[in-house]
Amino acid sequence: MQVLRERGIVRLRKFVSAGITAATITRMERAGDVIRLGRGLYQLPDAPTSAYHDHAVVAKVIPTGVICRVSALAFHELTDVIPSRVWIAIGPKDRKPGLAYPALQVVRFSDRHIRAGIEHHNIDGVDVLVTAPARTIVDLFRYRQAEGPRFKSSPGLNIALEGLREALRQHKATPAEIARCAEQVGSWPVIRPYVEAMTANA
């Protein structure tokens, strides 16, 4: 179907607006012509997908959500950790999404910070919001205690340090960018010693 080829992942309401009924989509699903990813979410069975297809699925369901923390760090290739769930930030008053797959780790950003340091990335035809490398590192230091069942035995500080080290080594974030981002949220006193230690002999 053209709409699926063009968009990759399509909501049911998009089909309906194109004149395709829900009953037709159900028949196509039973015939194997489309795959149901989640409630009201479909793609072609042979659609090319990237390593971060789960991010695209989440963004289609939660278009204002922001991929953050460990998921953002992995997306920017700044850690060897492979998160078992997608870390997604939503606003303080947004309803917590119910999604059977992929598994989510939902956090909340304030209205002030929900759009600060955010990048747009096209993943499998979907516009996905991801925290920029500097913002990602600052967030990991701000919330450096272990969070979620996947990280109970993995200290958050270690992941933050790995991200900082790799971001500086790969030139994906400069000390100035990290400092500026940290100052905006009042976390520079916490992060500064680590940045200075890693750049002292650079």
Q: Residues of each region from the PLM?
A:
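Short amphipathic alpha-helical segments and their helix-coil junctions
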Residues: 51-53, 112-124
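Exposed, interaction-prone assembly regions rather than primary DNA-binding/catalytic cores
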Residues: 73-118
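Short helix-to-loop capping/linker segments positioned immediately adjacent to catalytic or ligand/cofactor-binding
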Residues: 12-16, 77, 125, 148-151
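Hydrophobic alpha-helical interaction segments
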Residues: 118-202
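Short His-Asn-centered micro-motif
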Residues: 18, 90-91, 131
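Short beta-edge/loop segments at beta->alpha junctions of small alpha/beta modules
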Residues: 1-70, 98, 194-202
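Hydrophobic/basic alpha-helical segments enriched in Actinobacteria
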Residues: 14-17, 28, 33, 64-67, ...
